[in-house]
Amino acid sequence: MKDLKNQIMRKTTLFIFSLLFISSILFYPKTTFAYPFWAQQNYESPREATGKIVCANCHLAQMPTIAEVPQSVGADSVFKAVVKIPYKNDLKEIGADGSEVPLQVGAVVMLPDGFKLAPQERWTEEIKEETEGVYFTNYSEEKDNIIIVGPLPGDTNKEIVFPVLSPDPSTNKEYHYGKYSLHIGGNRGRGQVYPTGDKSNNVVFTSSTSGTINSIDTIEDGSYKVNIENENGEITTEAVPVGPQLIVKAQDKINAGDPLTNDPNVGGFGQLDAEVVLQSPYRVIGLIAFFIGVGLTQILLVLKKKQVEKVQAAEGI
């Protein structure tokens, strides 16, 4: 009965998240590009064999991501993995239509096998408050230990709390007590490359050839066509979408690879690894017994010392 309830809760949460995501694509396409959803669509696992999280394939700029995970947790317990995605307040970026939009954030937490998103009935009031407005989803049905979040408004979600449930080795022999690794990624802002490999408008555009800029055509939608004439008189046209600002003008001489625009990107992706120890209750009991034993030994030594001092004093030594 409990498993059925958990499945219903998971499916309901996923359904709500899907509705929100589809709505965001339909009504706000300019702010919903290259977040964890795209990784789901294109990669079986969000982490490559090299250790790189695949979000970095679209988000080329590097920015710090911070994680707070408890040093150790008990079996079958709920704990918080906090992902911090820092950036300057009220920072704006360019959307797909070239307008300024607020940054959004996304995060992925790859938990060890056996660890998973804690069911909502086990969330504390504090966790419920900290996760209000945040929708979690599993990377896939087969990978319930990989949790993704986003896109979310960045200014109010620079810290994302993931409620995690640890496994219980006493009831499932597949899992063991010991040290485990977590792989965490956090992103702010749009990507520079689409999953197809095409550039977005959130990147520096460069010249593919050397020569002189013959002319620059401004298109109706605000984009540009930069016409470059090489030494043989051949014209190469570079398309620059709306958004980035041109830093060249007609008659400028340029080389292949030179930038034609500024760098409009203000966001970036960061990843890190963390460790957590799944603590055996017997080890905890053993440590407590050890410390009690050490304490008693010290007390006995002090008492023995005082007894010796009394004997010596009585004998006039």
UniProtKB/Swiss-Prot annotation:
One GO cellular component, as annotated: plasma membrane-derived thylakoid membrane
BP terms from Gene Ontology: photosynthesis
Q: Which InterPro entries match?
A: Cyt-f_TM, Cyt_f, Cyt_f_lg_dom, Cyt_f_lg_dom_sf, Rudment_hybrid_motif
Task: Classify the protein's membrane topology as the record does.
Answer: Single-pass membrane protein
Q: Keyword annotations for this protein? A: Electron transport, Heme, Iron, Membrane, Metal-binding, Photosynthesis, Signal, Thylakoid, Transmembrane, Transmembrane helix, Transport
Q: Where is the signal peptide?
A: 1-34
Q: Which residues cross the membrane?
A: 284-304
Q: What does this protein do?
A: Component of the cytochrome b6-f complex, which mediates electron transfer between photosystem II (PSII) and photosystem I (PSI), cyclic electron flow around PSI, and state transitions.
Q: What is this protein called?
A: Cytochrome f
List the source organism.
Prochlorococcus marinus (strain MIT 9312)
